[in-house]
Amino acid sequence: FWLSETPDVPSKGWDAVLPRICSWGHFKCKDTGFEFLFFNLHMDHIGKKARVESAFLVQDKMKELGKGKELPAILTGDFNVDQTHQSYDAFVSKGVLCDSYEKAGFRYAINGTFNNFDPNSFTESRIDHIFVSPSFQVKRYGVLTDTYRSIVGKGEKKQANDCPEEIDIKTYQARTPSDH
């Protein structure tokens, strides 16, 4: 669905500079019957209202797409804001979602996820988030900055503006590598 006032129609939302979407899936474990929803998005980098309204839209869609079952959900993506911004609060303030960083029993995160294309930078700013329903137990959380130094070929270094994150949720393991 589109992160806009008209989520069923390709569109830019609110004050967004670019059209943005949220992809989702409904999953069911064959062995246990456990069901959950998984969402991934890339929020606008400029539109403040778009980010806040998108946060509320995604949470409304979680309820709608669960078809009355109140299924647990995982939401990943590049949110283009860190843990100090209003749109981050919009995700965690309703009690529908928790930040896996905050919920984790163990954190391997010596750096945040935003590096502005500088592999030597240090930041506590986390713009890539993994949010989970309160029913999930998050055992470990990691920001894997070692990927900055991966050899791509002939001595070239891999460049990225965000760090991959990895969490282990109960018996499920999720890895969200950043695409940029």
Regions found by a protein language model. Give the residues of each.
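Metal-dependent phosphoester-hydrolase catalytic domains
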Residues: 62-73, 81-180
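His/acidic metal-ligating clusters that form di-metal
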Residues: 19-39, 49-91
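A short local loop/turn or secondary-structure capping micro-motif enriched for an aromatic residue
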Residues: 6, 46-48, 147-151
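Generic anion/oxyanion-binding catalytic loop in active/binding sites
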Residues: 14, 47, 173
